[in-house]
């Protein structure tokens, strides 16, 4: 299955690039750089000639093409489209290969279709936060499933001997995945509501922030009736509440994931220990990036890296859980009529 593995490796790299481009596009306020989908002002590329701009004026009255933002959006779409085609190809190869995994590739292809729809709705629904958040989560899920598929294509390298692994750890891994996923949702909700700069002090927020908490409006996921959601529609109390929740979630996530890392490292299996180190390093990097976002007022490079760090964290935690559940086949010996397992 060498071809399968190579293609999945390429897909993993391409997915990380798409995640970076998506974050860069969103944080550069270029999410509506092209107001239609899948093209840009009715073109496959960004219109720039006099004739093309004349057509834009006729079909999109009152709108002005911003080339820098439009190109950011289209480059993101080109990479995302290429990733989708690659995943479809991987799925077909797996379906026609007798011993190749089937379920994960099919789910990946379905997820690509869902991501395309969410990408379209992100534009047509003018950056509605719940759609933006779902699109972000879908991209991370693609990353996770591709990593799991890679493990399935190299099964002997991602197995452990259960007698050397605490059985409670396998179930705890599910809890940690849920915690990290929830924190990613909170991060996506913070970003899509433009709430990342609502608190400028550590560890929680400045002033009497408790008296400003507005839970009702902060988590109204179906906040309808707005012509556009670009730059946010919520008032300060709601945005501040979202930001505070994300910070508290970060503290809970740090405690849970660090506990998980120490527990993983105590196991005797080398691959489990390696994953523990990798998860711990990414977690510490995420904390540093999150603090830097606050101290330096959300620099673009740091914010984009924070997005990729979140994707790496959920991927590594998910892979560690997968590995913990892959039991290494027992070794059978027959010596003079006796059978040992």
Task: Label the model's feature ranges.
Residues 238-295:
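Helical hairpin unit composed of two closely spaced alpha helices linked by a short loop
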Residues 6-38, 178-190:
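N-terminal signal-anchor transmembrane alpha helix
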Residues 92-106, 167, 261-279, 336-339:
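Membrane-interface helix-loop-helix junctions at transmembrane boundaries of multi-pass membrane enzymes
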Residues 30-73, 196-236:
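Extracytosolic (periplasmic/ER-lumenal) interhelical loops and adjacent juxtamembrane/interface segments
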Residues 71-89, 130-142, 241-259, 303-312:
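Membrane-interface loop-to-helix entry segments
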Residues 24-36, 113-136, 189-201, 239, ...:
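Interfacial helix-loop-helix junctions of multi-pass membrane proteins
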Residues 2-17, 101-108, 161-182, 272-281:
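Interfacial segments of alpha-helical transmembrane regions
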Residues 148-172, 315-341:
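A juxtamembrane structural motif centered on a specific transmembrane helix
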